[in-house]
Amino acid sequence: MVRNEIKAVKEESKKRNFLESIEISINLKDVDLSDPKKRINEEIVLPSGRGKDLKVALISSEEMKLKAKNADYTFSPEDVSKFVDDKKSFKKLANKVDFFVAESTLMSSIGKNLGVILGPRGKIPRPVPPGQDPTALIENLKKSVRARSRDRRTFHVPIGTREMSDDDLYNNFVTVYKRIVSRLDKGPGNIDSIYIKTTMGKAIKVETGDLND
């Protein structure tokens, strides 16, 4: 059933002159989202990737920076001090970067000085122990999505792009769905409905009964 809706959302949505994302809207029910412990806040690695380039920034010592060949941006501890004095520039960077990674010894300083900017955006850095190679973590982040409900019963999660194959989108959908269901007290019973759409297209309801067997 899910495969049918993925195919339909492509066929029924007019192609645009830019790379459209495909996202799902998840509507919860019977969940007390006023309790932060009940909220969905997941970072999920998509098995088929995002279908587009994501930007990852690394804040670390020079030693770690040299190992992270796949980081899109690299910053030093001194750069953190500069950002403290120029928060406007850092806000622009935070909006442009999808994920931050930081050497664990810098996390306290980053949280204290830049947490007010990164926290609300859900972009608190992922810590890496000193001396460790962050390459694999960065690679996974480039294939990851965030699923965050906050205190709202409806939230949205991208599962790829229109140019991806139906099979790749299906695999990504199943991964996101199963992770979210695993975090709900009643599992599928806490899902009211799920819709899928392209960036500019109309939403189509997804039937997930075959995933709950």
Swiss-Prot record:
Classification via InterPro entries: Ribosomal_uL1 (IPR002143), Ribosomal_uL1-like (IPR023674), Ribosomal_uL1/biogenesis (IPR028364), Ribosomal_uL1_3-a/b-sand (IPR016095), Ribosomal_uL1_arc (IPR023669), Ribosomal_uL1_CS (IPR023673)
Domain of life of the source: Archaea
Entry GO terms, CC: large ribosomal subunit
Keyword Cell cycle recorded: no
PROSITE patterns the record matches: RIBOSOMAL_L1 (PS01199)
Residues passing through the membrane, by range: none
Annotated keywords: Repressor, Ribonucleoprotein, Ribosomal protein, RNA-binding, rRNA-binding, Translation regulation, tRNA-binding
UniProt cross-references to PANTHER family, sorted A to Z: 54S RIBOSOMAL PROTEIN L1, MITOCHONDRIAL, LARGE RIBOSOMAL SUBUNIT PROTEIN UL1M
Subunit-structure text: Part of the 50S ribosomal subunit.
Protein role: Binds directly to 23S rRNA. Probably involved in E site tRNA release. Protein L1 is also a translational repressor protein, it controls the translation of its operon by binding to its mRNA.
Protein name, UniProt field: Large ribosomal subunit protein uL1
Organism: Picrophilus torridus (strain ATCC 700027 / DSM 9790 / JCM 10055 / NBRC 100828 / KAW 2/3)
Gene coding for it: rpl1
